[in-house]
Amino acid sequence: MAAAAFEVPAALTTSESTMAAERAAAPVQAVEPTPASPWTQRTAHDIGGPRTRTGDVVLAEPADFESLLLSRPVLEGLRAAGFERPSPVQLKAIPLGRCGLDLIVQAKSGTGKTCVFSTIALDSLILENYSTQILILAPTREIAVQIHSVITAIGIKMEGLECHVFIGGTPLSQDKTRLKKCHIAVGSPGRIKQLIELDYLNPGSIRLFILDEADKLLEEGSFQEQINWIYSSLPASKQMLAVSATYPEVLANALTRYMRDPTFVRLNPSDPSLIGLKQYYQVVNSYPLAHKIFEEKTQHLQELFSKVPFNQALVFSNLHSRAQHLADILSSKGFPTECISGNMNQNQRLDAMAKLKQFHCRVLISTDLTSRGIDAEKVNLVVNLDVPLDWETYMHRIGRAGRFGTLGLTVTYCCRGEEENMMMKIAQKCNINLLPLPDPIPPGLMEECLNWDVEVKAAMHTYSSPTVATQSPKKQVQKLERAFQSQRTPGNQTPSPRNTSASALSARPKHSKPKLPVKSHSECGVLEKAAPPQESGCPAQLEEQVKNSVQTSVEDSSSNSQHQAKDSSPGSLPKIPCLSSFKVHQPSTLTFAELVDDYEHYIKEGLEKPVEIIRHYTGPEAQTGNPQNGFVRNRVSEDRAQMLVSSSQSGDSESDSDSCSSRTSSQSKGNKSYLEGSSDTQLKDTECTPVGGPLSLEQVQNGNDTPTQVEYQEAPETQVKARHKEGANQRSKQSRRNPARRSSYRVQSEPQEESWYDCHRETTASFSDTYQDYEEYWRAYYRAWQEYYAAASHSYYWNAQRHPSWMAAYHMNTVYLQEMMRGNQ
């Protein structure tokens, strides 16, 4: 198959499509256009275009919407939105709905069910009454936003129409304001229930209740309780519509309890699959480890993308984490990939859907969040990375391809054994023609031609693709000036790599390895990494780079705008990157130093949890001053100490207490030998100790602040020795007899760390002169370490010594490095 890349003009030139793109990419607060806007949005599929349409939407005898006896504004809105001829389900269901009957509508995915209830709702409105008359519920926020866009597009000719969407992730104050003047309310069950409870939404005025994807809304354990609550608050005299592509028999019978003599509108109930959709499956090897199966499926997916030409593809996964991981893998391979899942915020989800519908991405990795109701007409390939849990989900997933009678392709990857048997049961239940994927994949597997609205050009064998500037020259100049001002500030002598790469170093190739972000741990003494010298430069050079980059960006933007004005057309599409499968990539190797940097970055910030470094050795010379990270200070309150005491007492047995007391006594012996071996000059220094306990480090540093109720006296050498002996013996006895006093003593004993630290700070200055031998130097530090832990009677360090978890961490890190080296080989 000849290598080809798909490229289209860079920007839309018509005001209609430009405003549609801005509307879809806007934040949640601006998802709704005003109904009085002078532009119209095309929502319907272009059935008169070059794409093939099957019998799912094409009628044997042509008909039009005027034969359905709709009002004039609705007919004009349908024509403006692009609806030319009704589909079979629209032709049968709209007249029954206009008669006021309760309907249960079942039709194949992508055959125009949203237009059915949107037309019925708009034609039954009384615009002079500004109360909420129609309530539409959808299982996901994305479906609710899509329904709102269809209603506003069809109702563009209805003056004064107020239709709003109410979903989670938006402020309640905004919903309260919109409900003061709202004809049609579209939303998710959770937010609608909340608005009714807060008396923001008056359910007494609702005359039409619509359930889109009714089988999902009434599914047990999903939204059933919320739907029942909302239904009980609505008036008894109302019309109700239930719409879905799949209806289990049990659920269809249960729907009759909500309705008054409902009318079933079913098209092809025995054959729910689309005519123009080819369905394949591929069996992969099964492994005990899940990540091995995922790796093999990913390899098959990349091979499929490289051999099957497609417009847009949807890849479904059963797990959120696996979907995001797959999106990262495909993005690293060069595929324009986006990811959408339920754990993303609302702005990210709407942005991903806007990119899919506006053809700004070729591949969308998703969970079952987008398996229902989402309409993207250019999607002609659906891949199930995991087998769905039920046949309804499978039918909704594959229904994202082949929209409105077009041709499409679906591939399902299943493991050998259980998943394969589950896939066969789904095929038997749905009466579908499921075929094994040919190996090798033939060139003509995708029947639909790709040149219907995409320009095909020969692929260029390049290793770096130029980035397309998406901002205006004025904004680029402002960003460069802000970056230059930040470099000249006295506090920022070392510019961050992020600013330099965004401004003066914008010409860096795309495939270069990015810098790993490093967080500054001010409380731990870890400084942020400075930029390389060649990137920072002097202010004069930086200013010259800024001027040059501004001039080049302005010239490039002006030339691009002139070129676009010549080549663009009203029916063109936004420019997107081409698939990397048609390019030759340069192999990249990593050095051991880069692997170590990657490992340290993963340990510190890989899981987005900052790591506090409590011990940081920078050499004997750097230890003479105040350490950056600081030793354990008196930061534990009495409540925290009481919690530590209770937790240690519940987990420690009697034998643990004995071992701790013996360990303390042995450490006190080491303390005695250390104090006897100390220098005479250190003992001659005046050492003031309070009767109630030694001073804390904060009290020593703040000499002006005198502590209350503390008396000072001289502490000779004998008192220091006796205090350590008695303190070690009394701690082991009092830990058994009076555990309540242990917490207060523990808080008092922590300032001993500070006094030891003051003494240690004075003695370390002479270590470099006294201990010239390397072994003797570390032996002195070992004695100081024993002295420190003898003074710190903290259960944290006891548990650390009793449970050596550092060995487990060492083995884990060893295995991690071995796996990385093995993968590199």
From Swiss-Prot:
GO terms for molecular function: ATP binding; ATP hydrolysis activity; DNA binding; DNA-binding transcription factor binding; histone deacetylase binding; protein domain specific binding; protein-macromolecule adaptor activity; RNA helicase activity. Residues 94-265 form the Helicase ATP-binding domain. Residues 646-668 have a biased composition (Low complexity). Residues 27-50, 465-573, 642-753 are annotated as: Disordered. GO terms for cellular component: cytosol; Gemini of Cajal bodies; RNA polymerase II transcription repressor complex; SMN complex; SMN-Sm protein complex; transcription repressor complex. It holds the Pfam family DEAD. The modification Phosphoserine is found at S188, S270, S472, S501, S506, S561, S653, S655, S657, S673, S678, S679. This is Probable ATP-dependent RNA helicase DDX20. The modification Phosphothreonine is found at T552, T689, T706. It catalyses: ATP + H2O = ADP + phosphate + H(+); a ribonucleoside 5'-triphosphate + H2O = a ribonucleoside 5'-diphosphate + phosphate + H(+). The SMN complex catalyzes the assembly of small nuclear ribonucleoproteins (snRNPs), the building blocks of the spliceosome, and thereby plays an important role in the splicing of cellular pre-mRNAs. Most spliceosomal snRNPs contain a common set of Sm proteins SNRPB, SNRPD1, SNRPD2, SNRPD3, SNRPE, SNRPF and SNRPG that assemble in a heptameric protein ring on the Sm site of the small nuclear RNA to form the core snRNP (Sm core). The lineage of its organism: Eukaryota, Metazoa, Chordata, Craniata, Vertebrata. GO terms for biological process: negative regulation of cell population proliferation; negative regulation of transcription by RNA polymerase II; oogenesis; positive regulation of apoptotic process; regulation of steroid biosynthetic process; spliceosomal snRNP assembly. PROSITE patterns: DEAD_ATP_HELICASE, HELICASE_ATP_BIND_1, HELICASE_CTER, Q_MOTIF. Residues 465-475, 484-504, 547-571, 698-711 have a biased composition (Polar residues). A motif (Q motif) lies at residues 63-91. The gene is Ddx20.
